[in-house]
């Protein structure tokens, strides 16, 4: 069989792009060689519909062992009692939970996408906003912070069946204990989508949702530094509150409903090569090396925020607790779109992002989102964050000066030589 030189040439170009540039997209990271090896292994050949020990195909004895390892490691890492590691993505993990606990038209209460939430938390362009009656809470215009009392007030007014917490562009920690009290007060179930801060949560650097939330979903990439995929966790299993029973008349456990919602509900065969890579990522995340890494992510992000504040930039919420910052560029007279386009010319990759109460469209935006997981994986520390802020500031001040931007691009390329990819 002929080698597909066209595709492999493009892969090599992408390698060069990643190797020579500054990767500051908050949802991206660089996985280890052993994770890539597992993801590209012969496990991609195997079909394994069902769960370990209960498959619809033969020859699953070995993948059963692999998936069981992934499940047990996920439970150990997050101190959970139950896990399903089959979701292909965070969005599918969220869909599986919603399909398990909601009926079309049920009310959900999520964090406003325009304030830093996620599409799958009720956005009208997403299944979550099309199948369910979506309501939202957001941040305060004065502080950029979530007002938990207001969340409680909205919940009482809306009376949702499911409350969703979690974000894609919120730089602060979450009060899961307070949210559980709100959920209990209105009789709602509580879902925490920790896709972004999962790595920090797993090692105790942020509040833990597992003791308080009925369901926890996450991606396995981002701060967890694993392969692209999703996962569902529960701190404790419980009988479903909907009266759904087994053929013997016993109430089904919530884990049974969730498993069935993943398969056959929304997926067919699981990706066992990716599940193997997830298992490796979970083991890596329990190591001392990973703890030092994720602690450095938090330190780097705080330093980066300070470096931008020093240069007159407006950090939404005034700072950061996690792995990202959201910068409101309106006082700099440049849109998020223009900033993103100028920075990519300098080999600095990040994304334009809506800021709370934005007066620009989602395709233009007034802000940029910056994350440190990928550059921290490459070995960068606080002093490097100061340099990154200086480069970004320089590009934005000279966004129409092509020669200046090209000079910065070359400087960055040379600088990155000391920080090899894993």
UniProtKB/Swiss-Prot annotation:
Database matches in Pfam families: SHMT
Disulphide-bridged cysteine pairs: none
Pathway: One-carbon metabolism; tetrahydrofolate interconversion; Amino-acid biosynthesis; glycine biosynthesis; glycine from L-serine: step 1/1
Signal peptide positions on this chain: none
Residue positions, PTM N6-(pyridoxal phosphate)lysine: 222
Origin: domain of life: Bacteria
Catalytic reaction annotation: (6R)-5,10-methylene-5,6,7,8-tetrahydrofolate + glycine + H2O = (6S)-5,6,7,8-tetrahydrofolate + L-serine
Enzyme Commission designation: 2.1.2.1
Keywords: Amino-acid biosynthesis, Cytoplasm, One-carbon metabolism, Pyridoxal phosphate, Transferase
PROSITE patterns for this protein: SHMT
A GO biological process held by the record: glycine biosynthetic process from serine
GO MF terms, alphabetically ordered: glycine hydroxymethyltransferase activity; pyridoxal phosphate binding
Cofactor(s) the protein requires to work: pyridoxal 5'-phosphate
Binding site for (6S)-5,6,7,8-tetrahydrofolate: 113, 117-119
Site (Plays an important role in substrate specificity): 221
Protein role: Catalyzes the reversible interconversion of serine and glycine with tetrahydrofolate (THF) serving as the one-carbon carrier. This reaction serves as the major source of one-carbon groups required for the biosynthesis of purines, thymidylate, methionine, and other important biomolecules. Also exhibits THF-independent aldolase activity toward beta-hydroxyamino acids, producing glycine and aldehydes, via a retro-aldol mechanism.
Family per similarity comment: Belongs to the SHMT family.
Assembly with partners or alone: Homodimer.
Name of the featured protein: Serine hydroxymethyltransferase
């Amino acid at each position: 069989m002929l080698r597909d030189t066209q595709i492999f040439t493009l892969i090599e170009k992408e390698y060069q792009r990643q190797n020579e540039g500054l990767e500051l997209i908050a949802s991206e990271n660089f996985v280890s060689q052993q994770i890539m090896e597992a993801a590209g292994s012969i496990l991609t050949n195997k079909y394994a519909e069902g769960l370990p020990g209960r498959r619809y195909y033969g020859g699953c004895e070995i993948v059963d062992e692999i998936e069981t390892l992934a499940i047990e490691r996920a439970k150990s890492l997050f101190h959970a009692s139950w896990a399903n590691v089959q979701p292909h993505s965070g969005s599918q993990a969220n869909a599986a939970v919603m399909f398990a606990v909601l009926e079309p038209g049920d009310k959900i209460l999520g964090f406003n996408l325009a304030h830093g939430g996620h599409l799958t938390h009720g956005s009208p362009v997403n299944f979550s906003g099309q199948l369910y009656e979506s309501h939202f809470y957001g941040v305060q215009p004065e502080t950029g912070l979530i007002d938990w009392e207001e969340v409680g007030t909205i919940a009482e007014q809306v009376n949702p069946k499911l409350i969703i917490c979690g974000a894609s562009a919120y730089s602060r920690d979450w009060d899961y204990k307070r949210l559980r009290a709100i959920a209990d007060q209105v009789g709602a179930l509580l879902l925490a989508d920790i896709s972004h801060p999962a790595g920090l949560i797993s090692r105790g650097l942020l509040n833990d949702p597992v003791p308080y939330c009925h369901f926890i979903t996450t991606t396995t990439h981002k701060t967890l530094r694993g392969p692209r995929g999703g996962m569902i966790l529960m701190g404790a299993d419980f009988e479903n509150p909907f009266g759904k029973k087994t053929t013997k008349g016993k109430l089904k456990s919530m884990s049974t409903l969730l498993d069935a919602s993943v398969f056959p509900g929304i997926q067919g065969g699981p990706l066992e090569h990716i599940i193997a890579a997830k298992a490796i990522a979970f083991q890596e995340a329990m190591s001392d090396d990973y703890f030092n890494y994720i602690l450095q992510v938090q330190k780097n992000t705080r330093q980066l925020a300070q470096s931008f504040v020093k240069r007159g930039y407006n950090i939404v919420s005034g700072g950061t607790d996690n792995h990202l910052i959201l910068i409101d560029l309106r006082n700099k007279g440049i849109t998020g779109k223009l900033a993103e386009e100028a920075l990519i010319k300098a080999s600095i990759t990040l994304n334009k992002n809506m800021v709370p109460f934005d007066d620009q469209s989602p395709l233009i935006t007034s802000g940029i989102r910056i994350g440190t997981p990928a550059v921290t994986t490459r070995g960068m520390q606080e002093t490097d964050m100061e340099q990154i802020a200086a480069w970004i500031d320089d590009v934005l001040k000279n966004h129409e000066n092509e020669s200046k931007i090209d000079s910065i691009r070359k400087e960055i390329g040379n600088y990155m030589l000391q920080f090899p990819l894993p």
